[in-house]
């Protein structure tokens, strides 16, 4: 089982690297959050990764579809840096990636692949408009990411 997980991680990096190598892009937070706000629903459709990926793409990020919890490997590849959760103050465009909750059965589609969402400046949105950052009742490990502007990702 470990070897399958390891191979999956390698495949993610190779595919993500293929699509993002030498990609110079600027991420437009306003376009991404507007897209997500307009398309976010009132109830979950269990497609958080799809909706968040489409918002990232609307903002100019060369995002690909992945299971939600695997975005923790992808976000650093596309110029998003991890932000410490201690003393965290959300900013528009921030992305949160939740691990799969322990004990979650593969038979339940909800949460099996983790969860990913973006902050639009007012609330967290994935495939639905969330009441708080975490969609889970129990405490689940998560990572926060913020787009970093650098000379490398500015188009000339």
PLM segments and residue spans:
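N-terminal capping segments
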Residues: 15-66, 111-112
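Compositionally biased non-globular segments, especially hydrophobic aliphatic-rich helices
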Residues: 11-14, 19, 71, 154
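...with weaker cross-activation on analogous glycine-rich loops/strands in unrelated enzymes
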Residues: 40-41, 62-136
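A broad structural signal for short, well-ordered beta-strand segments within beta-sheet-rich domains
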Residues: 138-142
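Low-complexity, Gly/Ser/Thr/Pro-rich intrinsically disordered linker/tail segments
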Residues: 143-156
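N-terminal Sec-pathway targeting helices
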Residues: 1-12
């Amino acid at each position: 089982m470990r070897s399958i997980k390891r191979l999956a991680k390698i495949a993610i990096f190779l595919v993500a690297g293929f699509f993002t190598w030498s990609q110079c892009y600027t991420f437009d937070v306003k376009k991404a959050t507007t897209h997500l706000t307009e398309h976010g629903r009132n109830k979950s459709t269990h497609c958080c990764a799809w909706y968040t990926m489409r918002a990232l793409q609307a903002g100019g990020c060369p995002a690909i579809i992945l299971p939600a919890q695997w975005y923790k490997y992808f976000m650093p590849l596309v110029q998003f840096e991890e932000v410490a959760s201690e003393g965290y103050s959300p900013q528009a465009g921030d992305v949160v990636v939740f691990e799969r909750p322990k004990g979650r059965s593969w038979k339940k589609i909800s949460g099996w692949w983790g969860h990913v969402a973006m902050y639009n400046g007012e609330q967290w949105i994935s495939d639905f408009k969330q009441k708080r950052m975490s969609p889970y009742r129990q405490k689940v490990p998560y990572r926060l990411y913020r787009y970093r502007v650098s000379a490398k990702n500015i188009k000339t």
